[in-house]
Amino acid sequence: MATIIDGKAIAEKIRADLAAQVKELQSRGITPGLATVLVGSDPASEVYVRMKGDACNKLGMHSVKITRPAETTEEELLALINELNNDPAIHGILVQLPLPPQINADRVLEAISPAKDVDGFHPYNVGRLVTGKPTFQPCTPYGVMVMLQEAGVDLAGKEVVVVGRSNIVGKPVALMCLQRNATVTICHSKTRDLPGRVRAADVVIAAVGVPEMIKGDWIKEGAVVIDVGVNRVGEKKLVGDVEFAAAAERASAITPVPGGVGPMTITMLLHNTLEAAKMAGSGNR
């Protein structure tokens, strides 16, 4: 039976360390500030924004939630981003996706100052990630890397299969594994023989958004399974992209859903916001 990689416990440990660092910064007159921007009233987005704000407040960070109606124009949103870029009390800017159809999300994300891009989505920061330079790393992939490290998984020489190729998780997590000397295969909807690819993997990272798509008997004996997916089945049940119970019989370690990668995403957002505040305080932007 697999060891459960407890994302909640790892996140709590990291947040305790972050809280101590926030106090130290505050002693120098700097309080890390995060602005979250929500356009419209998507219920799931409202929950995510509230969770991010609550997490900031618990650490002693400054949190600002800015809501705009769904009919907000792209020009109005870009003007708001410009204001936040020039606000010295704000170190991180997060625009909650998805945005209404009249707004081009790429243009909005590119308008955020790279020094305040704590989501790691700006092309400047993506380019630095690709070339292996220090940068804000996207929060979910960063959380996955920290979980693997905490679980004692050394990726060097390992066969890693990433299922999913999104800009938010699949592509960046594959890059991060490559930088840690793994041999990486990215699978997607056009991949031939997905079960065969997964069966060859020492580490499986599932980020495709399809409930229990990765079957337990696809998992190699002793493999490590990181399940990024969060899918609602019925009214209350949450499941990942991996068939958890069956996979846990074969894997050496596995993340649960919920309680796995999810808590790490917000934790790494807090980490990035703290780093942005440190850079602003040192004038290194």
From Swiss-Prot:
Gene3D superfamilies: Leucine Dehydrogenase, chain A, domain 1, NAD(P)-binding Rossmann-like Domain. The keyword Hydrolase applies. Pathway: One-carbon metabolism; tetrahydrofolate interconversion. GO terms for cellular component: cytosol. It catalyses: (6R)-5,10-methylene-5,6,7,8-tetrahydrofolate + NADP(+) = (6R)-5,10-methenyltetrahydrofolate + NADPH; (6R)-5,10-methenyltetrahydrofolate + H2O = (6R)-10-formyltetrahydrofolate + H(+). CDD domains: NAD_bind_m-THF_DH_Cyclohyd. It comes from the Bacteria. Its EC number is 1.5.1.5, 3.5.4.9. The keyword Amino-acid biosynthesis applies. Keywords: Amino-acid biosynthesis, Histidine biosynthesis, Hydrolase, Methionine biosynthesis, Multifunctional enzyme, NADP, One-carbon metabolism, Oxidoreductase, Purine biosynthesis. Signal peptide: none annotated. One of its GO terms (biological process) is tetrahydrofolate interconversion. One of its GO terms (molecular function) is methylenetetrahydrofolate dehydrogenase (NADP+) activity. Pfam families: THF_DHG_CYH (PF00763), THF_DHG_CYH_C (PF02882). Catalyzes the oxidation of 5,10-methylenetetrahydrofolate to 5,10-methenyltetrahydrofolate and then the hydrolysis of 5,10-methenyltetrahydrofolate to 10-formyltetrahydrofolate. Homodimer. This is Bifunctional protein FolD 2. The lineage of its organism: Bacteria, Pseudomonadati, Thermodesulfobacteriota, Desulfuromonadia, Geobacterales.
